[in-house]
Amino acid sequence: MWTPTTRVHYSRRAIRYQSDLTDEEWRVIEPHLPLAKATGRPRAWPLREIINAIFYVMRGGIAWRLLPSDFPPWSTVYRWFAAWRDACLFERINHALIMTDRELAGREASPSAAIIDSQSVKTTEAGGPRGYDAGKKINGRKRHALVDTDGRGLILEPHPANIQDRDGGGPLLQASRRFFPFIERAFADAGYNHERVTTATIVMVEIVRKLPDQIGFAVLPRRWVVERFFAWIGRNRRLAKDFEATVDSARAFLYAASVMLLVRRIARAS
């Protein structure tokens, strides 16, 4: 419920654009960005402006070339994005911020339970890998997400939409063992009830089935948390569809959206 106190707490009117980092948010993310090299040409633009520009593109759903003139040149911003994408920087920042946010919430840094689900979205003429999801009747890509019980995005992976959940779930759980080795249980829907998922790792997969008398939509235990995560990152218009020509860029934007959520949450709690 909104109150005068919460409205002031969440207000972003004092900054240039709604997607810009506040001073508190910059202090959260700055330690995780690469330091300037001791030799060579000095940076022409501060990294804070580069991050602000990337978040602006993601939040507004615009093309790189349409960046306003008060940001660094679009080509400079894109080069930084591509370098960070190839270095998996957003994934590493996301991992570090998840542990920080969990500890601020009074929980263990690494989760012991998670929820897995997928979301199919359309692609555009940009090209790249895609497929047809016969169940959702969508030609595009599928976003697989593994989130903790509070809805933080642990592992995010896009791939062609024709890959079924039972084929995409196993690799996602295997990837989680590297960053979150203490996960013991994963909740999932019936699409993951297959040995390719249940035997992929030592994580026990618990299927949360629909209610016996369920007709239409219903909020199901555990599973709603990952749906809420998709709704959270879906506020970024760049993610309304998959506009990226490569899966690597699509993955980087998914993690960047998760990082934006975590940075704001940690800054408010600090």
Name these PLM-found stretches.
Residues 1-270:
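Short alpha-helical elements
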